[in-house]
Amino acid sequence: MGDYINVKEIFGCDVFNDSVMQDRLPKKVYRELKKTIEEGKELSMEIADVVAHEMKEWAIEKGATHYCHWFQPLTGVTAEKHDAFVTAPREDGKVLLSFSGKELIKGEPDASSFPSGGLRATFEARGYTTWDCTSPAFVRHDAAGGILCIPTAFCSYTGEALDQKTPLLRSMEAINTQALRLLRLFGNTTSKKVTPSLELSRNIPGRQGEMLQRKDLIYTGRTLFGAMPPKGQEMDDHYFGTIRQRISAYMKEVNEECWKLGVTAKTQHNEVAPAQHELAPIYAPVNIAADHNQIMMRILKKSCQPPRYALPAS
């Protein structure tokens, strides 16, 4: 029974979700934060300071030493800059751990290294990260230790979107506004918000480790077969076939890591193509689903590294 996983116990254990906020935040602060999340009302700095303090204390209990504004630039993967919670040493040589509401809400990273920055100098390509409070923060554990990841949007000084998240949030707001108008037209006067949902499944090619030595095959960017695959049911690796043990062990590790970070990994099966498999989560609000997609991609890449399963990192 050493491999037993209590899903109810571990699910969302590394996420600063609504349950954690109810337990840790004062009732007034919790109510104000929920209004911001659900109605888009502005969050005062006084409330933000309390939220930041409790988020920091919770993250430290989870083993975090740093925090980062976690955003999705136009590179197709996430970006982040780690800052430790430590402050300047006091006169006695000891340090305090601090995390303010200002640090939670807004950051100012360099945008010159991203596709939107081009060849401009650093001071001319400023980018601002802004906390997306509708997507919960989480603690990620890796070789760097524990990192408090705060989902954010990434914009220019003049408000142009520099990431994938900002247009998504704006489109969600546009859909909400127009959908509510339509509902009112049909006589619905009680609905307060319309939220689009999304499910992003991931396909996993299961190549053998020794094949990774063939860089020429990897650089083609496509699946190669030396002979035509069987057309009928001659083999047992079809869509509903039993998943191979090596892939099952890999998916077990991926599922556990996903559940800890609140990703509802639900379905796993073989794909139609030989040596390909799929892992799919449950539908979630669009912006959260987009974040979960990036979390899943990182977990898939991290877990497939040799010598454990020798699966491709792409």
Language-model region placement:
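Histidine/acidic residue-rich metal-binding segments in metalloenzymes
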Residues: 2-15, 19-101, 105-123
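Glycine-rich, acidic/polar active-site loops that bind/position phosphate-bearing ligands
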Residues: 125-313
